[in-house]
Amino acid sequence: MIVADGSEKRGGTLRARKLLLGGLGLLLLVASGSSFYRHRHLEESVVLSPDVAEVKKLSEYFDGIRGTVNDCNVYFFEGEEPGATLFVMGGTHPEEPGGRLAAWLFAENAVMERGRLIVVLSGNRSATTVTRVGGAYPTDFTIPTDWGAQTFRMGDRWSNPLDQWPDPEVYIHYPSGQSLAYVDIRNLNRVWPGRPDGTLTERTTYAFLELIRRENVDVFIDLHEAELQYPVISTIVTHERGEELAIFVSMMLSDEEFNIGTEYSPKNLHGLSHREVGDASQAISLLFEAPEPFLDATRGRTTREQLLTGVDEFVMKAGEHGLLFEHIDEGGWPIDVRVGRHTSTVLRTMESWTELHPDRPLSCRGVPRYAEVIAEGLGHWLHDPSAAAPGRLVTE
């Protein structure tokens, strides 16, 4: 009887433990599922600039992405006078918010005086709905504004596995046949020029290339940020057809606003926008990189504060040991500095293009430059959705 009582007692304890652990697991499942759902469905408001003439869907250029998460908004600005066409893309890598927010300032503030402007805020919209697995990234971040605050989705470098899965053991780039990392089949900046019958990410770049061709884009700009341990940083990466323009922009910015270099797109590295867009279309393709300490492997706590201030003592320590390709000090690399670098570089590209091609000018007003963004904060140029005029509010 004593043995039986002991067995019953142990059995009851085991059942209680199973119930407790099962309950805890269910609680974690509900909590994480709720967080994932809120992240994926967080709505981001865009108050359209008075100069936005039209907002199209990317699927108007390729029906193969219609109804998918990557059927993003495309914003069109028509200049008061004719000129060239410039396409600015943010959100290729949504874990690099400086590029996306710089494009946002154009969407909400730009007024084209000469030429046309096309803006995309969420190049890989799928990647805005997930953060890096195991990276402990925040799911969102908030920018203070004159009217309160605006919250944005934090994203990843790759498309959400919920939208594209599984990954191959080795990713074979089309059409070059080059072998790349398996996960890069979900990287928008490794699948250019795309293909109509490919994965979601490949179909997305195919759609963008159709847009570039049909709209006769003259200059394509892809906005990015990079970790300080990455050698391609604080620079303009250019296709060989854009060398003169990129060097002109770099020279003028380095003389008047901030230092920025020039890199040449490698001809034997495929899938990147600065190579494939220039090869497959009439457009000059450029890629801008700004520093983002949040991405460094040697960073400290991965928090919203670190994302927005760019302050990190561990990245600074790496710099003391000569491991960085860009300087960092106690001031870090705040989001205002990173966004300001991009807005000034885009505006300077328009000015330099116009000097080189006076018969096809580009001119824009209303968008703040580097010093203005730092002085006022980028939130000063984000507009209150509740005060938007009828028909001038859209959702990303």
Pin down the residues of each PLM region.
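C-terminal accessory segments enriched in acidic
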Residues: I2-F76, N109, L200-A207, L211-V219, ...
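Proline/glycine-enriched tight loop/beta-turn segments at coil->beta junctions
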Residues: E78-T85
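Structural motif
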Residues: T85-L86, V219
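Active-site histidine-acidic residue metal-binding/catalytic motifs
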Residues: V88-G90
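Second-shell loop/turn segments in exported
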Residues: T92-H93, W192-G198, G332-D336
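Di-metal (Zn2+ and/or Mg2+/Mn2+) metal-binding site signature of metallo-dependent hydrolases
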Residues: T92-L101
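Active-site/substrate-binding loop(s) of hydrolase catalytic cores
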Residues: P97-G98, E113-M251
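A short, Lys/Arg-enriched amphipathic alpha-helix followed by its capping loop at the start of a domain
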Residues: A102-G115
